[in-house]
């Protein structure tokens, strides 16, 4: 499994279960498997709504998927993932990103059509290739991980492949 890829398709940044995974499971996974070079992780976008799509745009736009911004967005999800219109979501999102001192050109990110296409194509690929219909969904070596996304379950699955 050394160098094997685990693909996390939990990038609906408005998904509370995804935020929980990112905050409570990912750190142990990173420490014990990613940092040790046993697995690598590739994030794919699977936005469930316009707020998640725009958050994904910011995470990729000038940061190329910068994990620091990704962590920040998950950690502050309750502050920005609220509103009844796209404008409200965007206003909250921009306010939270600025509070973290990230340097982002908001309009450039929001209006980036090729980036939007890339993010939406990740979602389409997930549906077509892996029958993904919800978040979080995790793939290990191209196969859906069907158990509860706890560190214990993931550790057991990874160790079984070693």
Predicted regions, residues:
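Sequence contexts marking disulfide-bonded cysteines in secreted/extracellular proteins
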Residues: 8, 16-19, 62
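Short pre-active-site segment immediately N-terminal to redox-active cysteine/selenocysteine motifs
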Residues: 11-17, 47, 134
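Typically the conserved alpha-helix immediately C-terminal to a functionally engaged Cys/Sec
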Residues: 19-34
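Cysteine-centric redox/oxidoreductase cores and disulfide-bonded domains
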Residues: 47-135, 139-152, 156-162
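A generic structural motif
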Residues: 37-39
């Amino acid at each position: 499994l050394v160098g094997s890829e685990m693909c996390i398709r939990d990038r609906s940044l408005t998904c509370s279960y995804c935020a929980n995974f990112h905050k409570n499971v990912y750190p142990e996974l990173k420490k014990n498997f990613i940092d040790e070079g046993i697995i690598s992780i590739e994030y794919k976008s699977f936005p469930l709504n316009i707020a998640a799509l725009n958050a994904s745009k910011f995470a990729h736009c000038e940061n190329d998927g910068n994990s620091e911004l990704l962590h920040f967005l998950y950690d502050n999800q309750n502050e920005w993932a609220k509103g009844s219109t796209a404008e409200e979501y965007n206003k909250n999102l921009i306010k939270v990103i600025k509070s973290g001192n990230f340097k982002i050109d908001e309009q450039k990110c929001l209006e980036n059509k090729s980036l939007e296409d890339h993010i939406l194509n990740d979602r389409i690929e997930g549906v077509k290739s892996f029958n993904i219909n919800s978040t979080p969904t995790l793939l290990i070596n191209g196969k859906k991980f069907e158990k509860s996304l706890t560190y214990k379950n993931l550790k057991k699955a990874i160790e079984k492949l070693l």
